[in-house]
């Protein structure tokens, strides 16, 4: 198993539903994410998930399987991910660095 620390920003959307609203779906997916032991931060256009590469990718696969179990035929997922090997950095660390630089401006 890879221990490579990963930050993934993910947005999952079911396609072909009868309603343009996806809040019920997002609620179910977010509940599953929070039930995992991985750190996550929900935001207005998705969720950032942090942890070891294999565990994060496994969770994303589980979320897809769960989505299909819920009866959704097609799921569109967009991901942005990052890794680094020189140090472990959380999503909040990245925000804090920029906020500090802004305050020093």
Curated annotation (Swiss-Prot):
UniProt cross-references to InterPro entries, sorted A to Z: MTH1187/YkoF-like, Thiamine_BP, UPF0045_domain
Domain of life, per lineage: Eukaryota
Family: Belongs to the UPF0045 family.
PANTHER family, A to Z: UPF0045 PROTEIN ECM15
Record protein name field: UPF0045 protein ECM15
Provenance organism: Eremothecium gossypii (strain ATCC 10895 / CBS 109.51 / FGSC 9923 / NRRL Y-1056) (Yeast)
């Amino acid at each position: 198993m890879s221990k490579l620390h990963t930050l993934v920003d993910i947005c999952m959307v079911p396609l072909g539903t009868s309603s343009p609203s996806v809040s019920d779906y997002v609620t179910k997916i977010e509940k599953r994410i929070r039930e995992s032991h991985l750190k996550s931060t929900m935001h207005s256009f998705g969720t950032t998930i942090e942890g070891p590469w294999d565990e994060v990718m496994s969770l994303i696969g589980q979320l897809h399987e769960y989505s299909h179990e819920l009866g959704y035929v097609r799921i569109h997922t967009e991901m942005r991910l990052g890794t680094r090997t020189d140090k472990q950095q959380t999503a909040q660390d990245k925000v804090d660095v920029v906020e500090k630089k802004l305050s020093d401006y």
